[in-house]
Regions:
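DNA-recognition element of transcription regulators
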Residues: 106-119, 155-165, 190-209, 217-223
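Receiver (REC) domain active-site loop signature in two-component systems and cognate sites
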Residues: 56
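Basic, amphipathic DNA-recognition helix from helix-turn-helix-like DNA-binding domains
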Residues: 66-132
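Active-site beta3 strand of CheY-like receiver
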Residues: 45-51
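Acidic catalytic/metal-coordinating carboxylates
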Residues: 34-37, 60-63
């Protein structure tokens, strides 16, 4: 069965090109021309994944995703954007984006990123390892990070969960930045490296209730989780 994609993009010529390319990959694509229409179509279609432009008339991609994430934390969302500042990336991830792709982009890279997000969504838990991180317990399959004393649970965005899983698997060791970028983004360009920095900062915030937990940056090499 084909995967349902909601593509929200106000450049209709670009949207048509992307739709045609995705349909050759067995995706079923619906197009919305702005955030307001995208929000309406989301509730009608309940797509398997959303690909959303940031800058649009009537309602921006940020506003649309903020509304969706009030009730849906699971459906993968990938932002398309010409906005490359760290603040923009932070805003997107804070709103619940799973990935970012900078315009202009190559269709094969978009397809790879979409399939990676969908693969996480549909994967089955088989012998999932539960990690204890100081005062926290982390289930990488469900992306649940639970504080053991308060039992407060945070559902991490998929990309943050993937990063934390790699750090937990190599606790006390350096996880090379390049490895994380290639595994999760497919390339190690500057834009993705800045996105990784943003997500590491967010993970530090999630874990800040235990002062003994540190994620350190080994300059020019990678990241290390210390307890």
């Amino acid at each position: 069965m084909s995967c349902r994609v909601l593509l929200v993009e106000d450049e209709l010529s670009l949207a048509s090109i992307v739709r045609d390319a995705l349909e050759t990959q067995d995706f079923e694509v619906a197009i919305a021309a702005d955030g307001a229409e995208g929000l309406h179509r989301y509730f009608d279609l309940r797509p398997d994944i959303l690909v959303v432009d940031v800058m649009m008339p009537k309602m921006s991609g940020f506003e649309m995703v903020k509304s969706i994430r009030q009730s849906d934390r699971e459906t993968p969302i990938l932002f398309l954007t010409a906005k490359t500042t760290v603040d923009d990336v932070v805003t997107g991830f804070n709103l619940g984006a799973n990935d970012y792709l900078k315009k202009p982009f190559a269709i094969p890279e978009l397809v790879v990123r979409m399939k990676a997000l969908l693969g996480h969504k549909t994967s089955q838990a088989k012998g999932t390892t539960i990690f204890t991180i100081g005062e926290f317990q982390f289930n990488p399959e469900t992306a649940h990070l639970q504080h053991l004393s308060t039992e407060e649970t945070t559902i991490l965005p998929r990309r943050e969960a993937d990063i934390l899983q790699r750090l937990c698997q190599h606790q006390g060791e350096i996880v090379p930045t390049q490895n994380i970028l290639l595994d999760l983004w497919g390339n190690d360009d500057f834009f993705n490296a800045r996105s990784l920095q943003v997500l590491i900062t967010r993970l530090r915030g999630h874990l800040s209730h235990d002062p003994h937990i540190r994620i350190i940056n080994v300059r020019g090499t990678g990241y290390k989780l210390l307890l």
